[in-house]
Amino acid sequence: MVLNNNIFCLLIYLLNFFFNTLVNAQEFKNLYSTYTDQSIDLDGKDDEEFWNQNSAGEEFWQNFPSDSLASQKTEVKIVHNDNYIYAFIKAFNSSNKYSIPSLERDSSVPGNDAVVLLFDTYKDGNNAFFFESNPVGLKKDALVSEGGDDIDMTWDIKWEVETYIGNGFYQCEFKIPLNSLKFPDGSKDWRFQVFRADIFTGEFSLWNKVPINQKAFDLGFFGNLIFDNPLGKSKTQITVIPYTSGINS
């Protein structure tokens, strides 16, 4: 019995060792968020000058079905001011075909073309804020915990997204209030990830590579979002969005 316990402990140690080696060998990307005091017209387009001056995160890597670069290009840009985080995602799609099985907020219907922003504001690899949209502006938000094992879809705040569908791509422009996110005062950086579900190609891909044998939302494989101007104080004022039943009575 003692021998079996020792073997079990050794196996646990080796698994932890190999996992930590994998994480340490992982390359973590950096994306830079520029501070802007310009007004932003939320319309799903990046025609404001600052968007085109900001570097884009590219080269998304598949987490499913293969371990390779995504076949369709995705770009992400972030800017911020004193009150909001703005994110712009351009998802290329050579087929011009999209799967949109539901328009209901926080819908759990599978098979949806979508992009997801994830912010680990305390950089603890345990919790993150989740914001999802799709080509027609579906809104889904959630709290991710336990390193990515648990996703609480009951969390709802007020935020905005506008989208635009062009020839061979769609775009999502997000506006997320800072007073709805908890973060350390004066934050200079967060851990960050972007996920894309491309139903036409059958690919799930991420901005910062997540190995194919790991779950897509594993917080241990986030990259870094770096603010050129540190954020102010966290002034979290959570506003809950009530659900409205679609059943006619």
Regions found by a protein language model. Name each.
Residues 9-20:
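Bacterial N-terminal signal peptides
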Residues 1-7:
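N-terminal secretory signal peptides that target proteins for export/translocation
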Residues 25-249:
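Structural preference for beta-rich elements and adjacent junctions enriched in aromatics
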